[in-house]
Structures are given as structure tokens and as C-alpha cells.
Amino acid sequence: MSKLVPPHGKEKKLKPLLLEGAALAAEKEKAKTLKVVPMTSREASDLIMLGIGAFTPLDGFMGYADWKGVCDKYTMADGVFWPIPITLSADKAVADSIGKNEEVALLDVENNEILGTMKVTEKYTIDKEHECKSVFWTNDAAGHPGVAKVMAQKEVNLAGPVKVISESFYPTQFKNVYQRPAEARKLFDEKGWRRVAALQLRNPMHRSHEFLAKIAVEVMDGLYIHQLVGKLKEGDIPADVRVKAIDVLVENYFVKDTVIQGGYPAEMRYAGPREALLHAVFRQNYGCSHLIVGRDHAGVGDYYGPFDAQKIFDDIPEGALLLQPLKIDWTFHCFKCGGMASMRTCPHGKADRLLLSGTMVRKTLSEGGELPKEFSRPEVVKVLQEYYAGLEEKVEIKLHGAATGDVKKK
């Protein structure tokens, strides 16, 4: 019997919505006959997360009561904790053409593929600004990429249970790293792990990430380096490059069999504290008992305080999650200490510290600069330098307060 933390929800069982075998073949044929609802890249990635059971216990895209409950008090209509709305929008003409309980095919527009079907049980409109203020803590569509996506949603939300018929390109393009929750749980069980810490990544690992990871390795049975292979914002490093960079780091600087690397298909929302909670929910579904929450988790720009994503775990209803946050303070290289340290372990001043950030790594390398040796391992830097050298078009990367340390610790 598994010793891992059970999945999220009342039933404490994974709820994958991805069809297999004869049911899959039949649904694929049926989908060809249905009205088509186009999905954005975020909606498509959410559908795949539903399919693999990462969004257990959801059975589809949310209706109005769940949307409102999640925005206002982190709970769905049935009382189950959930931090961010998972919704599907359609333009009014498409929505008007769909009858109640009619089945529709869900099209991933970017990849021109039908990923699933949905029985439309509800159609409703939302206050987009209310969602943005609740989830992102801002309505700044010009500066915040997550807000911009919500404000660009179509006029009507469609809700109902889904059946997923494809995981898109993820299983083939990322075949050595992409995992479903059931697959990760099987790997953890085979190793006899019970206490597993997840390290959320959307950047290649620099020395601060490595430091966080090794703290977890010291106190847990194992570490799950779980990186996003879904869509990021412009200027972020692509998943295949990150996978390669993490591989060389784990191979050269971690004890064998203490770390598993995995990938998941969600798209970043950059919702900071609320997204940290979503990361916690689906990491619990993957079998992780803990989530490492460091500085500026899932943030963008200066919209959130550096530790707001840690504080929010203290504000949610008691018992909402079985997974626990592993909260870690500012980490940096201290020249006086002679290595990596944190605010809790280093007594020295700012002048003695080199703050490390993914943004700084990307900016320096994209401009052809040399990173200080304290920033990242040479094997990792080599992978990243090769990537940036091959770019035909350079992307401007702006530094923000959380990347430079010029923020007040709230």
C-alpha cells in the first residue's frame, strides 16, 4: 500500500479524465461530428491537466457557483478548496449556438488538434475585473501577462464535464520528462518514498535553486524537480533547454536516486500567491507531501511581495491542503560565509551578498555577458550559452525588484 499523501478532494483518489482503449477511439470518432469550440493555449493546457488527473477532483470546466466561490473564498460549491478558476470561454455567437447539455469538441487552436469533448451544462458571464483583482491582486492588463489573458477571454463562459482524448505533443516532445500524476506516484512508491518535496521550476536551476533543492534532500525522502513544460512568457527559456540544463546539474551535483525530474503541461498564470496554492494542489495530486516555496514564487514584475506566496498558506482554511509548504528565506551567495546562505543563516550585510535570480541569469546571458561563477554551475552555463548563441532574435529582459533585491520584505 502506498505511503504517499492522498490526492486532493473528498474522495482522495486520482480522477483522470483521459480516455483509453475503445472509449478513446469512440470519442475521437464522435468528436468529428460535434460543434467545435476553440480554446486558448491556457484553456488547452488546463484541459490536459484535467485529463491526466493533475486537477483532481475537478470533472471539467467550472460553472458560475464554483467560479464565484473560488474567487471569493478559495472554495468550490461543494466546499472543496480550490485557489484559481479553471474556466473555458467562447464568443457570444458560438455560445448562443450551443444548446443546454449539448456536447461540443474542444479545439486547441495553436496546434490545430481536438483535445477533448465537453457536455455544456451551463453558460454564464463573469466580471473579469473581479476575477483579476481576486486572483492576481491587480487589474493591470498592460503589465501583467495573466491579467491580460483573462481580460482577453471571450464574452461567455461554458461549463461542464469533459472527456480528454489527447495530451497534445507533450508525451512525444518531452517523453523523458513529461509525467502524469499516477506515473510520478508509481516512481515514488518504487523508491519507498513517503515525504517528497516538489521544487517548482520555470527557469534553469541556478545556485539558489540548487541550495533549496539540497535543503529538501537533507530532510525529505526524495526531491521531485517538477518543471513547467507548458507555455511561458516571451523571454523565458524553452522547456527542452531547461530539461537539458537540469539533467547536467543533477548528474554532476546530486547523489544518485535522491532526485526525480518531471514535467507538467500547465501554462504559467504568474498569479504569485494564488498560483503557489494551485501548485500545491496539483503537487499533492502528484504524490508530494511538501512544496518548496521560496522568494517570489510564481510572481512576475513587482506585483507581489517576495514572500506573499509563503504567507498565503497561513490564510487558507485549516485542513484545505494535506501538502505542506517548505518555506525558505532569501538565499544568496555570501562572500564572507564562503558559499550559499540564507537570511536565517548569514549574519552579514548586503554588500557581502550576491543575490541570484533566474531573471538576472537570462538577462546576462541574452546580452552575451559572463555570469559570475557563484551564479550557476559551469555545465549549466554551457547549455544556456549554446541556447542564447543560437537565437536569431534577441528578446529584451527587464529586471524587477524581486530579481535585484531592491524590494522591501513585506
Curated annotation (Swiss-Prot):
Pathway: Sulfur metabolism; hydrogen sulfide biosynthesis; sulfite from sulfate: step 1/3. GO terms for molecular function: ATP binding; sulfate adenylyltransferase (ATP) activity. Its EC number is 2.7.7.4. Pfam families: ATP-sulfurylase, PUA_2. It catalyses: sulfate + ATP + H(+) = adenosine 5'-phosphosulfate + diphosphate. Keywords: ATP-binding, Nucleotide-binding, Nucleotidyltransferase, Transferase. InterPro entries: ATP-Sase_PUA-like_dom (IPR025980), PUA-like_sf (IPR015947), Rossmann-like_a/b/a_fold (IPR014729), SO4_adenylyltransferase_pro (IPR020792), Sulfurylase_cat_dom (IPR024951), Sulphate_adenylyltransferase (IPR002650). The keyword RNA-binding does not apply. It comes from the Bacteria. One of its GO terms (biological process) is sulfate assimilation. PANTHER family: PTHR43509, SULFATE ADENYLYLTRANSFERASE (PTHR43509:SF1). NCBIfam families: PRK04149.1, sopT. Belongs to the sulfate adenylyltransferase family. This is Sulfate adenylyltransferase. It comes from Syntrophobacter fumaroxidans (strain DSM 10017 / MPOB).
